[in-house]
Regions:
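A short, internal acetyl-CoA/4′-phosphopantetheine-binding micro-motif in the GNAT/acyltransferase core
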Residues: 46-52, 167-174, 202
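Conserved catalytic-core motifs of GNAT/GCN5-like acyltransferases
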Residues: 83-95, 200, 218-232
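A conserved beta-strand-loop-helix scaffold within acyl/acetyltransferase catalytic domains
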Residues: 128-138, 142-170
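N-terminal charged segments
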Residues: 1-78
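Conserved active-site alpha-helix within GNAT-family acetyltransferase domains
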Residues: 77-82, 180, 203-221, 229
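Conserved acetyl-CoA-binding loop-helix of GNAT-fold acetyltransferases
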Residues: 55-60, 175-191, 209-214
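Short amphipathic alpha-helix that is part of the acyltransferase structural core
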Residues: 1-12, 96-127
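Conserved hydrophobic beta-strand within the GNAT/NAT acetyltransferase core sheet
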Residues: 164, 197-201
Length: 235
C-alpha cells in the first residue's frame, strides 16, 4: 500500500497537509510553492511538501528569510547551514476510538476571550498558542467564578482530521477531570463535522500522555518537534 493510500497518511506530514488544504487561508507559501508556514500570530509551525527535496528546504529558507527561527515536525536532519535550536521528542496519537461527548459546562471561546486564553497558556505552558490561534477551529473553556480555568480546542486540520490542542487546566483546578471533559467536547465537535481527532504531545509529558491513552487515544508515531534557524546568507 502506498503512502498516499494508507489510512491517515496525511498525518505523516500534518502541517503541510493542513496548509495545503483546509488551512490554506492561514498559509504563507514559498516562491516555489514547496514550503509553507502559518501566518504570524497563528502558529509557529512551517512545513515542506517533501522533506527529502533540497529545493523545498531552499524554498523555506527564502520564505522565512536569513537567520530566522522556524519550527518543523517529524523531519529528517536538515541540510548544511541550518542550525538546530531545540529538539523535542513527541508522540502523535490517533483518536478515532475516543468517544466524543458534549459538555454542559463548556462555553465556546472566541477572539474576545484571547487575553484570558493567553494568560492561562502562559501559566500552564501546553504548547504554542498565539493571538490568532483561536481562529484555527473550535475552542471550549470552563469558567469558575467567571474565571477561565480550563480549555481545549483545535489546531492543525489535515484533510479529514483535526488536531486536539491547547489542552490546559489552571493548577488550582487540576484533578477535577476538566481536561478530559473538554477533550471529549472537542472530539464531539470534530466528529459532527465528519472528521477524526488526533493530537500531539511532548513524550516527556507522561501525565498528559497517560490521560490521552486512558481515553482511547492510541500511539500512531513518534515525531520530533524541531526548532531551526535558517541559513544566514549574509555570513
Amino acid at each position: 500500500m502506498s503512502r498516499e493510500s494508507r489510512p491517515g497518511a496525511v498525518l505523516d506530514n500534518p502541517v503541510w497537509a493542513a496548509l495545503d488544504g483546509p488551512h490554506r487561508g492561514f498559509a504563507e507559501t514559498g516562491p516555489a510553492g514547496l514550503a509553507a508556514r502559518y501566518a504570524a500570530g497563528v502558529s509557529p509551525f512551517a512545513a515542506l511538501c517533501d522533506p527529502e527535496d533540497p529545493r523545498a528546504w531552499a524554498d523555506l529558507a527564502e520564505l522565512a528569510g536569513p537567520g530566522q527561527e522556524v519550527w518543523v515536525t517529524g523531519l529528517p536532519t536538515p541540510p548544511a547551514g541550518w542550525e538546530t535550536l531545540m529538539s523535542i521528542p513527541g508522540v502523535q496519537l490517533d483518536g478515532r476510538a475516543v468517544r466524543g461527548k458534549e459538555e454542559p459546562e463548556a462555553v465556546l471561546l472566541g477572539p474576545a476571550d484571547v487575553p484570558e486564553m493567553l494568560e492561562l497558556v502562559e501559566l500552564t505552558r501546553p504548547g504554542p498558542f498565539g493571538e490568532r490561534t483561536v481562529e484555527l477551529g473550535t475552542y471550549f473553556g470552563i469558567r469558575r467564578g467567571g474565571r477561565l480555568v480550563a480549555m481545549a480546542g483545535e489546531r492543525m486540520r489535515p484533510p479529514g482530521w483535526s488536531e486536539i490542542s491547547a489542552v490546559c487546566t489552571h493548577p488550582g483546578h487540576r484533578g477535577e477531570g476538566l481536561a478530559g471533559r473538554l477533550i471529549r467536547a472537542v472530539v464531539a465537535a470534530v466528529e459532527e463535522r465528519g472528521d477524526s481527532p488526533f493530537l500531539h504531545a511532548a513524550a516527556e509529558n507522561t501525565g498528559a500522555v497517560g490521560l490521552y491513552l486512558s481515553m482511547g487515544f492510541s500511539l500512531r508515531r513518534e515525531p520530533v518537534f524541531i526548532g531551526l534557524r535558517t541559513p544566514d546568507t549574509k555570513a
